[in-house]
């Protein structure tokens, strides 16, 4: 599939497009003329650039026609939203793993995440909790280790056998 050009849409054009999508003011009927020809007949509205068109065919299937730059913009916004969600989940899972310095762990994780970026420029959909656990395993110095912090040696009675009353004063 051919990559669509990346054109920015101005705010007024965006507003017109959104308005045309919400009002559905541009309606057309798609009629089959021959096996390889179709006729698009405008029933309502007018043909204007940067507006959406709601099309019905003879079998009552509905379609929406939008300019190609709008599709590119929608795809870019979807990609940005996915990356924002992925980074938010990553930050949540970093906090769960008790980092010593959140910003340090965040930077390490973002660098490792960028290394996973695919050839098409997208980040893969990963399990962020497992990703952070792997970072914790490879870089334990970045996280608190509560197991060792609160571990006490097991109680041993032999440690108190040589206890005499003079030692009691030292307590």
From Swiss-Prot:
InterPro entries: UPF0763
Family: Belongs to the UPF0763 family.
Protein name as annotated: UPF0763 protein Hac_0849
Annotated source species: Helicobacter acinonychis (strain Sheeba)
